[in-house]
Protein backbone atom coordinates (compact mmCIF):
# COMPACT_ATOMS: atom_id res chain seq x y z
CA UNK A 1 0.00 0.00 0.00
CA UNK A 2 1.39 3.35 -1.02
CA UNK A 3 0.84 6.31 1.30
CA UNK A 4 1.52 9.97 0.68
CA UNK A 5 4.04 11.61 2.94
CA UNK A 6 2.85 15.14 3.89
CA UNK A 7 5.75 15.79 6.18
CA UNK A 8 7.58 17.79 3.58
CA UNK A 9 4.63 20.09 2.74
CA UNK A 10 5.67 23.75 2.98
CA UNK A 11 3.21 26.26 4.49
CA UNK A 12 3.99 29.65 2.99
CA UNK A 13 3.17 32.83 4.97
CA UNK A 14 2.50 36.33 3.72
CA UNK A 15 5.34 38.10 2.03
CA UNK A 16 6.31 41.57 3.20
CA UNK A 17 4.74 43.10 0.10
CA UNK A 18 1.45 41.30 0.73
CA UNK A 19 1.40 42.50 4.34
CA UNK A 20 2.03 46.05 3.24
CA UNK A 21 -0.81 45.81 0.71
CA UNK A 22 -3.22 44.53 3.39
CA UNK A 23 -2.17 47.29 5.78
CA UNK A 24 -2.64 49.88 3.05
CA UNK A 25 -6.14 48.57 2.28
CA UNK A 26 -7.09 48.69 5.96
CA UNK A 27 -5.75 52.25 6.23
CA UNK A 28 -7.79 53.31 3.19
CA UNK A 29 -10.94 51.75 4.66
CA UNK A 30 -10.36 53.51 7.98
CA UNK A 31 -9.81 56.77 6.14
CA UNK A 32 -13.10 56.31 4.32
CA UNK A 33 -15.03 55.32 7.44
CA UNK A 34 -13.73 57.94 9.89
CA UNK A 35 -15.48 60.94 8.28
CA UNK A 36 -18.73 58.98 8.24
CA UNK A 37 -18.33 58.07 11.91
CA UNK A 38 -17.51 61.68 12.78
CA UNK A 39 -20.57 62.90 10.88
CA UNK A 40 -22.80 60.45 12.74
CA UNK A 41 -21.26 61.51 16.05
CA UNK A 42 -21.74 65.20 15.29
CA UNK A 43 -25.30 64.62 14.13
CA UNK A 44 -26.00 62.87 17.42
CA UNK A 45 -24.39 65.70 19.42
CA UNK A 46 -26.35 68.29 17.46
CA UNK A 47 -29.60 66.41 18.09
CA UNK A 48 -28.82 66.16 21.81
CA UNK A 49 -28.11 69.87 21.89
CA UNK A 50 -31.38 70.64 20.12
CA UNK A 51 -33.28 68.45 22.57
CA UNK A 52 -31.70 70.22 25.55
CA UNK A 53 -32.74 73.59 24.16
CA UNK A 54 -36.24 72.21 23.67
CA UNK A 55 -36.37 71.26 27.35
CA UNK A 56 -35.31 74.75 28.43
CA UNK A 57 -37.91 76.25 26.10
CA UNK A 58 -40.65 74.05 27.53
CA UNK A 59 -39.49 75.06 31.00
CA UNK A 60 -40.08 78.76 30.38
CA UNK A 61 -43.61 78.01 29.20
CA UNK A 62 -44.32 75.83 32.21
CA UNK A 63 -42.99 78.61 34.42
CA UNK A 64 -45.24 81.05 32.55
CA UNK A 65 -48.24 78.77 33.11
CA UNK A 66 -47.54 78.78 36.83
CA UNK A 67 -46.71 82.45 37.39
CA UNK A 68 -48.27 84.26 34.43
CA UNK A 69 -44.92 85.58 33.24
CA UNK A 70 -41.49 84.47 32.12
CA UNK A 71 -38.74 84.19 34.70
CA UNK A 72 -36.44 87.18 35.20
CA UNK A 73 -32.90 86.85 33.90
CA UNK A 74 -31.66 87.75 37.36
CA UNK A 75 -32.85 89.21 40.63
CA UNK A 76 -30.14 91.32 42.20
CA UNK A 77 -31.66 92.45 45.46
CA UNK A 78 -31.29 91.04 47.92
CA UNK A 79 -29.96 87.64 46.90
CA UNK A 80 -28.77 87.72 43.28
CA UNK A 81 -30.68 84.81 41.79
CA UNK A 82 -29.99 83.91 38.16
CA UNK A 83 -32.46 82.44 35.67
CA UNK A 84 -31.55 78.71 35.95
CA UNK A 85 -32.66 78.69 39.59
CA UNK A 86 -36.18 79.66 38.54
CA UNK A 87 -36.32 76.89 35.93
CA UNK A 88 -34.85 73.96 37.88
CA UNK A 89 -38.29 72.66 38.95
CA UNK A 90 -39.33 72.52 35.29
CA UNK A 91 -36.33 70.53 33.98
CA UNK A 92 -36.61 67.66 36.45
CA UNK A 93 -34.15 69.19 38.91
CA UNK A 94 -36.58 69.47 41.83
CA UNK A 95 -34.04 68.12 44.30
CA UNK A 96 -31.53 70.81 43.37
CA UNK A 97 -34.26 73.47 43.50
CA UNK A 98 -35.38 72.32 46.95
CA UNK A 99 -31.83 72.40 48.33
CA UNK A 100 -31.07 75.89 46.99
CA UNK A 101 -31.56 78.59 49.64
CA UNK A 102 -33.10 81.62 47.92
CA UNK A 103 -32.62 83.73 51.04
CA UNK A 104 -28.87 83.60 50.43
CA UNK A 105 -26.67 84.63 47.53
CA UNK A 106 -25.52 81.97 45.09
CA UNK A 107 -22.00 82.27 46.52
CA UNK A 108 -23.00 81.57 50.13
CA UNK A 109 -23.21 78.24 52.02
CA UNK A 110 -24.84 75.85 51.36
CA UNK A 111 -25.49 77.12 47.84
CA UNK A 112 -21.75 77.21 47.28
CA UNK A 113 -19.07 75.76 49.54
CA UNK A 114 -15.85 77.70 49.03
CA UNK A 115 -13.20 75.94 46.97
CA UNK A 116 -15.15 72.69 46.71
CA UNK A 117 -17.80 71.20 44.47
CA UNK A 118 -20.00 70.26 47.42
CA UNK A 119 -22.47 73.13 47.15
CA UNK A 120 -25.88 72.99 45.47
CA UNK A 121 -24.62 75.25 42.67
CA UNK A 122 -22.05 72.64 41.68
CA UNK A 123 -24.76 70.14 40.79
CA UNK A 124 -24.47 69.28 37.11
CA UNK A 125 -27.03 67.83 34.72
CA UNK A 126 -26.99 66.59 31.13
CA UNK A 127 -29.34 69.41 30.18
CA UNK A 128 -26.52 71.89 30.91
CA UNK A 129 -24.19 70.62 28.20
CA UNK A 130 -24.08 70.25 24.44
CA UNK A 131 -23.05 66.79 23.26
CA UNK A 132 -20.16 68.30 21.27
CA UNK A 133 -18.29 69.41 24.39
CA UNK A 134 -17.48 68.49 27.97
CA UNK A 135 -20.27 67.12 30.12
CA UNK A 136 -18.93 68.31 33.47
CA UNK A 137 -17.70 71.89 32.99
CA UNK A 138 -17.61 73.96 36.17
CA UNK A 139 -16.40 77.40 37.22
CA UNK A 140 -13.32 77.54 39.45
CA UNK A 141 -12.22 81.06 38.54
CA UNK A 142 -12.79 82.28 42.10
CA UNK A 143 -13.54 80.70 45.47
CA UNK A 144 -17.18 80.02 44.67
CA UNK A 145 -17.16 76.93 42.50
CA UNK A 146 -20.29 76.22 40.47
CA UNK A 147 -21.60 74.50 37.36
CA UNK A 148 -21.39 76.11 33.93
CA UNK A 149 -23.53 75.55 30.86
CA UNK A 150 -23.47 75.80 27.07
CA UNK A 151 -27.00 77.24 27.13
CA UNK A 152 -27.68 80.91 27.71
CA UNK A 153 -30.54 83.37 27.23
CA UNK A 154 -30.94 86.00 24.54
CA UNK A 155 -29.93 89.47 25.69
CA UNK A 156 -30.60 91.31 22.44
CA UNK A 157 -28.40 93.62 20.33
CA UNK A 158 -26.99 95.51 23.31
CA UNK A 159 -23.97 95.26 25.56
CA UNK A 160 -24.08 94.92 29.30
CA UNK A 161 -25.23 96.94 31.07
CA UNK A 162 -28.13 98.18 28.96
CA UNK A 163 -26.86 101.77 29.24
CA UNK A 164 -30.28 103.36 29.46
CA UNK A 165 -31.82 101.54 26.48
CA UNK A 166 -35.54 100.83 26.72
CA UNK A 167 -35.44 97.17 27.83
CA UNK A 168 -38.84 96.22 26.45
CA UNK A 169 -37.45 96.72 22.95
CA UNK A 170 -34.79 94.12 23.49
CA UNK A 171 -34.56 90.89 25.43
CA UNK A 172 -37.78 89.27 26.62
CA UNK A 173 -36.21 88.54 29.98
CA UNK A 174 -36.33 90.61 33.09
CA UNK A 175 -33.03 92.32 33.58
CA UNK A 176 -30.83 93.75 36.30
CA UNK A 177 -28.75 96.78 35.43
CA UNK A 178 -25.26 96.04 36.71
CA UNK A 179 -24.60 99.64 37.68
CA UNK A 180 -27.49 100.13 40.08
CA UNK A 181 -28.89 96.66 40.82
CA UNK A 182 -32.33 97.75 39.68
CA UNK A 183 -35.35 95.48 40.08
CA UNK A 184 -35.96 93.18 37.13
CA UNK A 185 -38.63 93.71 34.50
CA UNK A 186 -41.08 90.87 33.96
CA UNK A 187 -42.36 89.84 30.53
CA UNK A 188 -45.31 87.70 29.51
CA UNK A 189 -46.77 86.37 26.29
CA UNK A 190 -48.84 89.52 25.78
CA UNK A 191 -45.68 91.59 25.28
CA UNK A 192 -44.39 90.13 22.01
CA UNK A 193 -45.51 92.39 19.15
CA UNK A 194 -42.83 90.78 16.97
CA UNK A 195 -44.29 87.33 17.71
CA UNK A 196 -42.88 84.59 19.90
CA UNK A 197 -41.85 82.59 16.80
CA UNK A 198 -39.68 85.54 15.74
CA UNK A 199 -38.02 86.13 19.11
CA UNK A 200 -34.96 84.23 20.29
CA UNK A 201 -35.08 82.60 23.70
CA UNK A 202 -31.88 80.54 24.10
CA UNK A 203 -28.77 79.70 22.15
CA UNK A 204 -25.32 78.27 22.76
CA UNK A 205 -21.96 79.54 23.95
CA UNK A 206 -18.59 77.86 24.21
CA UNK A 207 -16.82 77.49 27.54
CA UNK A 208 -13.11 77.52 28.25
CA UNK A 209 -11.71 74.02 28.70
CA UNK A 210 -9.86 74.99 31.88
CA UNK A 211 -12.30 75.21 34.80
CA UNK A 212 -9.83 77.34 36.75
CA UNK A 213 -9.56 79.91 33.97
CA UNK A 214 -11.36 83.15 34.84
CA UNK A 215 -13.55 83.06 31.74
CA UNK A 216 -17.18 83.61 32.63
CA UNK A 217 -18.74 82.54 29.33
CA UNK A 218 -21.26 79.90 30.37
CA UNK A 219 -21.14 80.91 34.05
CA UNK A 220 -24.93 80.90 34.07
CA UNK A 221 -25.61 80.63 37.81
CA UNK A 222 -23.81 83.94 38.34
CA UNK A 223 -26.27 86.85 37.93
CA UNK A 224 -23.58 89.37 36.95
CA UNK A 225 -23.53 91.16 33.58
CA UNK A 226 -22.67 88.84 30.68
CA UNK A 227 -22.86 85.59 32.65
CA UNK A 228 -25.58 83.31 31.36
CA UNK A 229 -26.42 85.48 28.34
CA UNK A 230 -25.51 85.96 24.69
CA UNK A 231 -25.79 89.17 22.70
CA UNK A 232 -26.56 89.63 19.01
CA UNK A 233 -24.08 92.44 18.44
CA UNK A 234 -22.14 89.91 16.35
CA UNK A 235 -23.36 86.97 14.26
CA UNK A 236 -22.96 83.36 15.48
CA UNK A 237 -19.37 82.12 15.77
CA UNK A 238 -18.10 85.55 14.78
CA UNK A 239 -14.37 86.09 14.50
CA UNK A 240 -14.77 89.50 16.13
CA UNK A 241 -13.24 89.75 19.60
CA UNK A 242 -15.70 89.60 22.45
CA UNK A 243 -15.46 92.20 25.22
CA UNK A 244 -15.45 90.72 28.67
CA UNK A 245 -14.93 93.59 31.06
CA UNK A 246 -12.05 91.65 32.60
CA UNK A 247 -13.15 88.02 32.77
CA UNK A 248 -12.10 85.97 29.76
CA UNK A 249 -9.22 83.95 28.37
CA UNK A 250 -8.54 84.55 24.68
CA UNK A 251 -8.81 81.64 22.27
CA UNK A 252 -8.31 83.28 18.90
CA UNK A 253 -9.65 80.27 16.99
CA UNK A 254 -13.03 79.57 18.62
CA UNK A 255 -13.44 82.02 21.51
CA UNK A 256 -11.71 85.33 20.69
CA UNK A 257 -11.96 88.03 23.34
CA UNK A 258 -10.38 91.16 24.76
CA UNK A 259 -10.20 91.74 28.50
CA UNK A 260 -11.75 95.20 28.39
CA UNK A 261 -14.88 97.10 27.49
CA UNK A 262 -18.57 96.61 28.16
CA UNK A 263 -19.64 93.04 27.77
CA UNK A 264 -20.70 91.34 24.58
CA UNK A 265 -20.78 87.57 24.18
CA UNK A 266 -21.64 85.96 20.84
CA UNK A 267 -23.54 82.73 20.32
CA UNK A 268 -21.00 79.99 19.59
CA UNK A 269 -20.91 76.23 19.10
CA UNK A 270 -18.76 73.38 17.86
CA UNK A 271 -21.39 72.45 15.28
CA UNK A 272 -20.34 72.90 11.70
CA UNK A 273 -21.76 76.04 10.13
CA UNK A 274 -23.83 77.59 12.88
CA UNK A 275 -25.59 77.33 16.24
CA UNK A 276 -28.77 75.82 17.60
CA UNK A 277 -31.27 78.37 18.86
CA UNK A 278 -34.66 78.16 20.51
CA UNK A 279 -37.44 80.68 20.11
CA UNK A 280 -40.06 81.92 22.53
CA UNK A 281 -42.75 79.76 20.94
CA UNK A 282 -40.69 76.66 21.83
CA UNK A 283 -39.40 75.96 18.31
CA UNK A 284 -35.78 75.00 17.66
CA UNK A 285 -33.84 76.09 14.58
CA UNK A 286 -30.29 75.81 13.36
CA UNK A 287 -29.02 79.30 12.56
CA UNK A 288 -26.22 79.63 10.03
CA UNK A 289 -23.05 81.60 10.70
CA UNK A 290 -23.81 83.42 7.46
CA UNK A 291 -27.10 84.92 8.69
CA UNK A 292 -27.14 88.67 8.10
CA UNK A 293 -26.47 90.76 11.18
CA UNK A 294 -29.67 92.75 10.55
CA UNK A 295 -31.78 89.58 10.63
CA UNK A 296 -29.93 88.10 13.62
CA UNK A 297 -30.51 91.26 15.62
CA UNK A 298 -34.15 91.45 14.52
CA UNK A 299 -34.69 87.93 15.84
CA UNK A 300 -33.34 88.96 19.23
CA UNK A 301 -35.90 91.72 19.83
CA UNK A 302 -39.44 91.26 21.07
CA UNK A 303 -40.77 94.70 20.16
CA UNK A 304 -38.55 96.03 17.40
CA UNK A 305 -41.07 95.84 14.54
CA UNK A 306 -38.26 94.92 12.14
CA UNK A 307 -38.92 93.57 8.66
CA UNK A 308 -36.58 90.77 7.54
CA UNK A 309 -36.39 87.84 5.17
CA UNK A 310 -38.05 84.84 6.88
CA UNK A 311 -35.92 82.45 4.81
CA UNK A 312 -32.78 83.13 6.78
Descriptions of predicted regions:
Residues 43-312:
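Surface-exposed loop/linker segments characteristic of extracytoplasmic
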Residues 1-9:
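N-terminal secretory signal peptides that target proteins for export/translocation
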